[in-house]
């Protein structure tokens, strides 16, 4: 039986599958509250596998979204730091570990990615994704 994952369309794209991946982008993050790279260029229609490595000693995450969505989510994380959340556009990565996000960018625009763990977003742990035709 062939089961297809069911993903919800978001303003910044939709969850992707391994079979759809067009390219892989390595992202590293650490306790300096920075992502490397901090800016990513993508073409509309590309499905990207983000291979994310946490080089720090603290828990970090990568969450993709619009600035408005990330601002709202970051506010919730400050109020409820142990809140469970798991969406295809986010990955929580323990110190020294790796994780991945597979995401299809089917809409053009400027989007953000961030670590929304309490205090990390506020410290500037954010990056930019430009999706163009």
Model-predicted regions and their roles:
Residues 22, 59, 122-126:
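Short edge beta-strand segments in beta-sheet-rich domains
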Residues 78-86:
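Short beta-strand and strand-turn-strand segments in soluble, beta-rich domains
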Residues 1, 60, 73, 120:
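Histidine-centered active-site/metal-ligand motif
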């Amino acid at each position: 039986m062939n089961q297809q994952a069911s993903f919800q369309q978001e303003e910044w794209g939709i969850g992707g599958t391994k079979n759809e991946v067009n390219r892989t982008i390595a992202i590293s993050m650490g306790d300096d509250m920075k992502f490397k790279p901090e800016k990513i260029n993508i073409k509309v229609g590309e499905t990207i596998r983000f291979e994310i490595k946490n080089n720090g000693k603290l828990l970090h995450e990568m969450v993709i979204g619009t600035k408005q969505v990330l601002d709202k989510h970051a506010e919730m994380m400050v109020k409820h730091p142990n809140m469970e959340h798991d969406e295809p556009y986010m990955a929580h990565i323990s110190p020294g570990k790796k994780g991945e996000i597979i995401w299809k960018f089917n809409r053009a625009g400027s989007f953000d990615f961030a670590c929304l763990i309490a205090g990390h977003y506020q410290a500037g742990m954010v990056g930019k994704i430009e999706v163009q035709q």
